[in-house]
Amino acid sequence: MSIGILGTKLGMTQIFDESGKAVPVTVIQAGPCPITQIKTVATDGYNAIQIGFLEVREKQLSKPELGHLSKAGAPPLRHLLEYRVPSTDGLELGQALTADRFEAGQKVDVQGHTIGRGFTGYQKRHGFARGPMSHGSKNHRLPGSTGAGTTPGRVYPGKRMAGRSGNDKTTIRGLTVVRVDADRNLLLVKGSVPGKPGALLNITPATVVGQQA
């Protein structure tokens, strides 16, 4: 796995390219993310690094969490994430990963949680067609048939019905980095990314599905 970075979604806006065309972009606060732990084959059986993100007050973390972070000389951090790496050479505890790891024109994968919708109905959750809305119809937003009768005498598992939707982990692949603001640790990525403003994101260099990173 390639080493990525954690960030938060700030929102969407648009910028203009050299030809004057408007480009929709998402602004991401990417890092800084200090390395909080380095794992090696000798000590843990595999090579990996753990990074932290989003500084918080000490009272918001437990004593074991604070002790773990203090070993790396890191401040109290809300989120921790691990990346597998082929080698840990050149990586040090406390080393900060910042937005300048990426460059304009680079392809990235962005992982996050979609906006939660709560308990939703058939149309909103699955895109079912509604019934007639005219006078006399009693089937405006009903689901229709949920199966046969006595045989099988039950609703099959997996039947699309009303229920909780959203707040699912998803990855948007192959997004283009339009601009990098290294001074403010901002990434401008073309298109939309999962979640609402303030949502936690995992940004990694793009990989082809099935390709060994």
UniProtKB/Swiss-Prot annotation:
GO terms for molecular function: rRNA binding; structural constituent of ribosome. Keywords: Ribonucleoprotein, Ribosomal protein, RNA-binding, rRNA-binding. The keyword Ribonucleoprotein applies. SUPFAM superfamilies: Translation proteins (SSF50447). InterPro entries: Ribosomal_uL3, Ribosomal_uL3_bac/org-type, Ribosomal_uL3_CS, Transl_B-barrel_sf. Residues 131-168 are annotated as: Disordered. PROSITE patterns: RIBOSOMAL_L3. It holds the Pfam family Ribosomal_L3. GO terms for cellular component: cytosolic large ribosomal subunit. GO terms for biological process: translation. The keyword Ribonucleoprotein applies. Belongs to the universal ribosomal protein uL3 family. HAMAP family: Ribosomal_uL3_B (MF_01325_B). Part of the 50S ribosomal subunit. Forms a cluster with proteins L14 and L19. One of the primary rRNA binding proteins, it binds directly near the 3'-end of the 23S rRNA, where it nucleates assembly of the 50S subunit. This is Large ribosomal subunit protein uL3. It comes from Synechococcus elongatus (strain ATCC 33912 / PCC 7942 / FACHB-805).
